[in-house]
Design a protein with these regions (language model features):
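Glycine-rich phosphate-binding P-loop
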Residues: 262-286
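Pre-Walker A (Motif I) flank of P-loop NTPase domains
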Residues: 256-262, 345-347
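Pre-Walker A adenine-sensing motif
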Residues: 242-256
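Conserved nucleotide-sensing/catalytic segment adjacent to the nucleotide-binding pocket
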Residues: 288-376
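Intrinsic disorder
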Residues: 258, 266-269, 323, 327
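Conserved catalytic-core segment of NTP-binding enzymes
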Residues: 373-374, 382-385
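Long, basic/Gly/Ser/Thr-rich N-terminal segments
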Residues: 1-241
Length: 385
């Protein structure tokens, strides 16, 4: 059967977008987490590591310092600064990306060498911690069980051989490591968590621990640096960011003792942003300045993470190419807001994002909110259907 001729670009529309639901194989190396300007590890190398370790491929990129700095600037502009919101949908995104670009290029780039030196120290410390932990797991000696004997057991000529625990020693070591995580500070806890993820993945995929300890350390170090390493960079750039924002005349959002949260829920492309004018009117009726709200809409980050025009005819796949990195930054924003909650510096929040884990339950079936709404004193929920 002859295939239908492809439609010219002008004939594509919302119900016929001209793209498949899966990213074409040829475009996988263009995922932003693996592009050479962003990561020291390309897609193919990360895929091989994922096939070996059982971890998701996106966890095994190796983001460069410059990219991690960009993540931290993105979340700070979003959470800390008042971003002008105009009448059109595009205005907020243009303003946000412009502010991020001004701070990044004007203030972070000149300090990048110093930031890189600081991050290298973080990386060396993490590598040392991980090496010790890997040695601990690989040399772990499982506790022994003494053989049971009856009342007349001493009359037996030969004692029963000592039985070891039925669990493999590396699993026992992992369990003990998990129990220690909650008692550690952020840095060692993050090292432990990264290593637990890697070793668990390898055991699930290979059925045993590998003998190449250096490989385990390297994979765990990637996981650590992409996550906690970014938080450490956040500490390094905090004074630079504050000075930059003040020099540019940007307005810091005031902390609120009783934050108001407006949370818009709905599927991707459901039109959540179209509700914003009504939310603005609601704020006015409550006597709350709209400029005091942090406008959290991660979709506006996409065009900062990727130059759509560079894709040519493949520009329609831009959302897929940025999606995995967007999740990275989104989780970092959650962590940053949790830190602000501890220091009681949370502003009013307008949240416009779609999260699959919004109503996640734990292993015991209990609901535990992961939403930023949990930081609100008064919460308004809006649903776009």
């Amino acid at each position: 059967m002859a295939q239908k001729p492809s439609l010219p670009d002008s004939e594509y529309h919302a119900w016929n977008p001209g793209l498949s639901s899966n990213l074409p194989t040829r475009l996988l190396p263009l995922i932003t987490l693996f592009r050479s300007e962003n990561s020291d590890v390309g897609y193919q190398q990360a895929k091989e590591a994922a096939d070996f370790s059982g971890l998701p491929v996106e966890q095994l990129c190796a983001l460069k310092v410059e990219r991690l700095v960009a993540h931290e600037v993105l979340i700070r502009v979003t959470a800390d600064l008042s971003v002008p919101d105009g009448p059109s949908y595009e205005y907020l995104g243009l303003q946000l990306r412009g502010m991020v670009d001004s701070i990044y290029r004007g203030y972070m780039v000149p300090e990048m060498q110093n930031i890189a030196v600081g991050f290298d120290l973080v990386r060396q410390r993490a590598k040392h911690e991980l090496t010790l932990l890997v040695d601990e797991i690989c040399s772990f000696d499982a506790p022994q069980k003494k053989p049971k004997s009856g009342f007349f057991g001493f009359l037996k000529r030969q004692p029963k051989p000592i039985d070891r625990t039925t669990k493999p020693p590396e699993l026992e070591a992992l369990e003990q490591l998990r129990q220690r995580v909650g008692n550690e500070d952020d840095f060692p806890a993050a090292c432990m968590t990264a290593l637990i993820n890697v070793v668990s993945g390898i055991l699930g995929k290979q059925g045993r621990i590998v003998t190449d300890r250096q490989l385990i350390v390297e994979l765990a170090l990637r996981v650590f640096c992409n996550d906690q390493g970014s938080a450490e960079i956040g500490h390094l750039i905090a004074p630079i960011f504050e000075n930059a924002a003040r020099a540019e005349g940007y307005r810091f959002l005031p902390a609120q003792s009783e934050p108001i949260v407006m949370n818009t829920k709905g599927a991707s492309a459901a039109g959540k942003s179209t509700i914003r004018p009504q939310q603005r009117l609601l704020a006015e009726r409550m006597g709350v300045p709209w400029e005091d709200f942090a406008l959290i809409s991660p979709d506006y980050w996409r065009k900062y993470l990727l130059d759509y025009d560079s894709l040519g005819v493949d520009y329609k796949y831009a959302a897929m190419l940025t999606g995995r990195e967007l999740e990275f930054v989104d989780k970092k924003l959650d962590r940053y807001m949790a830190q602000k909650a501890k220091t009681k510096t949370v502003p009013h929040l307008l949240i416009d994002r779609f999260r699959f884990d919004s109503f996640k339950i734990d292993s015991e079936g209990d609901y535990k909110s992961t939403l930023l709404s949990r930081f609100g004193s008064t919460v308004f929920l809006f649903f776009a259907i």
